[in-house]
Amino acid sequence: MLTVAEGILLCFVTSGSVLGVLGNGFILHANYINCVRKKFSTAGFILTGLAICRIFVICIIISDGYLKLFSPHMVASDAHIIVISYIWVIINHTSIWFATSLNLFYLLKIANFSHYIFFCLKRRINTVFIFLLGCLFISWSIAFPQTVKIFNVKKQHRNVSWQVYLYKNEFIVSHILLNLGVIFFFMVAIITCFLLIISLWKHNRKMQLYASRFKSLNTEVHVKVMKVLISFIILLILHFIGILIETLSFLKYENKLLLILGLIISCMYPCCHSFILILANSQLKQASLKALKQLKCHKKDKDVRVTW
């Protein structure tokens, strides 16, 4: 049984996850309409893939959390562990790959650098995405053996703390290799944000001689993209902190309240960042405002029918 505080927090994280699925579903729907209208772009493709992956991430986090709360014996089963581990590696790595690709796409489209390497990357943006896709496949090929290794050690020493049977250095190396792709894409996101800051600084210096209106428009674009990138980095850090809290609370402390707090923190990244993307993207923002107006009109029509 859950306490009152645990029940309230569980309702909160469940409601937030539903909103996150709806937000990502809206991005998916808006890009599907653009695809039907033959207005599908590279950014649209990345946003679509990102929305799909984040819906799966939310579902995995919430379903796994509910199982840990109400059916912990199922979580301890071999079948559940191996299936969830493989699915999590694929979906989580792919989600961060799409987010990093989006950040890099914004950098190449908005930033202005005179270096020939930047011009080369800007002209061959598809090649850059293919390179990142190759990095994703390499990260999978490294992560899968580490997942099997950790699972086998846990299976052999089921009744004892299985971490004891891995040397400390080996244990750290195994988890670094397991998340090597995530670490790489996270570093790319940080570098992208740093380059955008430099681009904004150079842009402000160059635009001092031009009209203030032109300057403000370009600066606004830079600042808007920087907010998206910084929010991504912060939320991703919180996401992994939440997963760590959730895992430790289940394996070591067996604290349900701490487990639910971990769920809340880990769900913030896939849920909140989707709404940040909607507000930062002019097309998605207009589509969301249009959808809200249609809902209001539908509600008014329904109220009028009820009064009659």
From Swiss-Prot:
Under the heading Pfam families, the entry gives: TAS2R
List localization entries.
Membrane
Q: Give the GO cellular component terms, alphabetically.
A: membrane
Indicate how the chain sits in the lipid bilayer: Multi-pass membrane protein
Give the stretches traversing the membrane: 8-28, 42-62, 79-99, 125-145, 180-200, 228-248, 258-278
Q: Which residues lie on this side of the membrane: Extracellular?
A: 1-7, 63-78, 146-179, 249-257
Query: Molecular function (GO) terms listed?
Result: bitter taste receptor activity; G protein-coupled receptor activity
Q: Which residues lie on this side of the membrane: Cytoplasmic?
A: 29-41, 100-124, 201-227, 279-308
* Glycan-modified residues: 159
SUPFAM superfamilies tied to this protein: Family A G protein-coupled receptor-like (SSF81321)
What are the alphabetically sorted keywords of the record? Answer: G-protein coupled receptor, Glycoprotein, Membrane, Receptor, Sensory transduction, Taste, Transducer, Transmembrane, Transmembrane helix
Tell me its family: Belongs to the G-protein coupled receptor T2R family.
Question: What other comment is given for this protein?
Answer: Several bitter taste receptors are expressed in a single taste receptor cell.
Q: What does this protein do?
A: Putative taste receptor which may play a role in the perception of bitterness.
Question: What name does UniProt use for this protein?
Answer: Taste receptor type 2 member 106
Q: In which organism is this protein found? A: Mus musculus
